[in-house]
Curated annotation (Swiss-Prot):
The keyword Ribonucleoprotein applies. GO terms for molecular function: rRNA binding; structural constituent of ribosome. Pfam families: Ribosomal_L21p (PF00829). Keywords: Ribonucleoprotein, Ribosomal protein, RNA-binding, rRNA-binding. It comes from Actinobacillus succinogenes (strain ATCC 55618 / DSM 22257 / CCUG 43843 / 130Z). Part of the 50S ribosomal subunit. Contacts protein L20. This protein binds to 23S rRNA in the presence of protein L20. One of its GO terms (cellular component) is cytoplasm. GO terms for biological process: translation. This is Large ribosomal subunit protein bL21. Belongs to the bacterial ribosomal protein bL21 family. It comes from the Bacteria. PROSITE patterns: RIBOSOMAL_L21 (PS01169). The keyword Manganese does not apply.
């Protein structure tokens, strides 16, 4: 059984027991979160596709960790000027473990 849900402007295909890295959620480690915007649920041959969401379906998850991703470097070179500008960015994320899918 797996489901596709939406969080942080992205869609994630998950199954029970899977650990997923999402955009930062303002939750503490160990808290439970429910995602109601489930777009599709598949259980063997039984497929439920929402328009746009499956009514009554939800994905339940537990927050495992909060953290920051790898650094992304942004470099802007100005040709023939011996000048450049560097900038870095580390995006915050939340890791959640999927504990249940209810359809």
């Amino acid at each position: 059984m797996y489901a596709v849900f939406q969080s942080g402007g992205k869609q994630h295909r998950v199954s029970e027991g899977q650990v997923v890295r999402l955009e930062k959620l303002e939750l503490a480690t160990g808290e439970t979160v429910e995602f109601d915007s489930v777009l599709m649920v598949v259980n063997g041959e039984d497929v439920k596709i929402g328009a746009p969401v499956v009514s009554g379906a939800k994905v339940v998850a537990e927050v495992v960790a909060q953290g920051r991703g790898d650094k992304v470097k942004i470099v802007k070179f100005r040709r023939r000027k011996h000048s450049r500008k560097q900038q870095g960015h580390r995006q915050w994320f939340t890791e959640v473990k999927i504990t249940g899918i209810q359809a």
